[in-house]
Amino acid sequence: MELLRGAALLLLLCAAACAQDSCTCTKNKRVTNCRLIDNVCHCNSIGSSVPVNCEILTSKCLLMKAEMANTKSGRREKPKDALQDTDGLYDPECENNGLFKAKQCNGTTCWCVNTAGVRRTDKHDTDLKCNQLVRTTWIIIEMRHAERKTPLNAESLTRYLKDTITSRYMLDGRYISGVVYENPTITIDLKQNSSDKTPGDVDITDVAYYFEKDVKDDSIFLNNKLNMNIDNEELKFDNMMVYYVDEVPPEFSMKSLTAGVIAVIVIVVLAIVAGIIGLVLSRRRKGKYVKAEMKEMNEMHRGLNA
């Protein structure tokens, strides 16, 4: 009997200790096995089990890997009226520090990426060499808000976005190089050179990913949806695009051009050829007219001389 009581007491003590050491990761809902270490919440990122510090933003690579793991297992939380959008989403390989590996592969197809995980080369076989992870130094975020009767107040909008980015995503304000409003388009520029970034600074690629998820109503934060209110009016968005500029130009060949770009090039070339043909035909017609006119004048002269 005493043995049973002792075992029960031990279980209660273990449960109490576990409850005391458990914690909640407010900055990343895609984690598991959360525990307190030196009064700081640490968890394991889903899909990789890499430990993350819940007081800072989780790296984009680990977030993408967790999202893919949730998608495969069917556990991904989907927002209301969600449509499937897999553009740009893949299962990445991450370093132990959470950064993207320079070389990413899907089976036997491989490519090189930047620090944002965006492909910057053509796709090759597994023999591809990616010598370094090229840093993304400039991120351009373009958003188009829903139709409004009146334009937004540009000053209020700029102040709100800068305050939100610095407080919610903990990005130093010096990395926000500009906010431009041209109704209905809002453009945010984030710039961060490797020489400017100091230890402890949040990376602009992580900030852009968190912000993009917030705007698209798929927040990474736990129970902390972003409600964008400008002058006490909720702001809705119809479209959002993110562009990445690296410190080294990308290495795409002509083969990688999209069908749309190729079509535009073909149309331009055809227009030039058509213009040249039209010019040649026009000159030929003009030449024939001049010859006919000269012939008539010569005949008139011969008639007068006769």
Swiss-Prot record:
Glycan-modified residues: 106, 193
Keyword Disulfide bond belongs to the record: yes
PROSITE patterns registered for this protein in UniProt: THYROGLOBULIN_1_1, THYROGLOBULIN_1_2
Coiled-coil stretches: none
Taxonomy, superkingdom: Eukaryota
Keywords: Cell membrane, Disulfide bond, Glycoprotein, Membrane, Repeat, Signal, Transmembrane, Transmembrane helix
Domain Thyroglobulin type-1 intervals: 58-130
Keyword Transmembrane helix assigned: yes
UniProt signal peptide: 1-19
One GO location term (cellular component): bicellular tight junction
InterPro entries for the chain: EPCAM-Trop-2_C (IPR049420), EPCAM/Trop-2 (IPR043406), EpCAM_N (IPR041630), Thyroglobulin_1 (IPR000716), Thyroglobulin_1_sf (IPR036857)
TM segment ranges: 261-281
Gene Ontology molecular-function annotations: cadherin binding involved in cell-cell adhesion
S-S pairs: 61-94, 105-110, 112-130
A Pfam family assignment: EpCAM_N
Segments in the Cytoplasmic topological domain: 282-306
Positions on the Extracellular side per record topology: 20-260
Membrane topology: Single-pass type I membrane protein
Subcellular location, record wording: Lateral cell membrane
Xref: SMART domains: TY
Family per similarity comment: Belongs to the EPCAM family.
Name of the protein in its database record: Epithelial cell adhesion molecule
